[in-house]
């Protein structure tokens, strides 16, 4: 037996402000019924003794320490630039004057 009827799909479509054809209503009813069947199968799985988790990985947001390191001077950074203006990289304009 279907878990969702064509009328229920039509109701959901109206709530969602979707204009569906009769063929689409039939198609979506079948697809949603298949989805709900799969969900029912998942819900039927015995999870007794299984610890709830939202992520199987225990190490989240592992980062290295932030350590100061030597970096280029302004002159060194601009030395290989095709063009520099007032100590900054000069690049072609990509946005309009607006």
UniProtKB/Swiss-Prot annotation:
Stated name of the protein: Aspartyl/glutamyl-tRNA(Asn/Gln) amidotransferase subunit C
Which InterPro entries does this UniProt record tie to the protein? Asp/Glu-ADT_sf_sub_c, GatC
How this chain assembles, per its entry, is: Heterotrimer of A, B and C subunits.
Q: Which organism is it from?
A: Mycolicibacterium paratuberculosis (strain ATCC BAA-968 / K-10) (Mycobacterium paratuberculosis)
Pfam families cross-referenced by the UniProt entry: GatC
What taxonomic lineage is listed for the species of origin? Bacteria, Bacillati, Actinomycetota, Actinomycetes, Mycobacteriales
Q: Which GO terms describe its molecular function?
A: asparaginyl-tRNA synthase (glutamine-hydrolyzing) activity; ATP binding; glutaminyl-tRNA synthase (glutamine-hydrolyzing) activity
Catalytic activity reads:
L-glutamyl-tRNA(Gln) + L-glutamine + ATP + H2O = L-glutaminyl-tRNA(Gln) + L-glutamate + ADP + phosphate + H(+); L-aspartyl-tRNA(Asn) + L-glutamine + ATP + H2O = L-asparaginyl-tRNA(Asn) + L-glutamate + ADP + phosphate + 2 H(+)
* Function (record text): Allows the formation of correctly charged Asn-tRNA(Asn) or Gln-tRNA(Gln) through the transamidation of misacylated Asp-tRNA(Asn) or Glu-tRNA(Gln) in organisms which lack either or both of asparaginyl-tRNA or glutaminyl-tRNA synthetases. The reaction takes place in the presence of glutamine and ATP through an activated phospho-Asp-tRNA(Asn) or phospho-Glu-tRNA(Gln).
**Biological-process GO terms, alphabetical:** glutaminyl-tRNAGln biosynthesis via transamidation; regulation of translational fidelity; translation
- Domain of life according to the entry: Bacteria
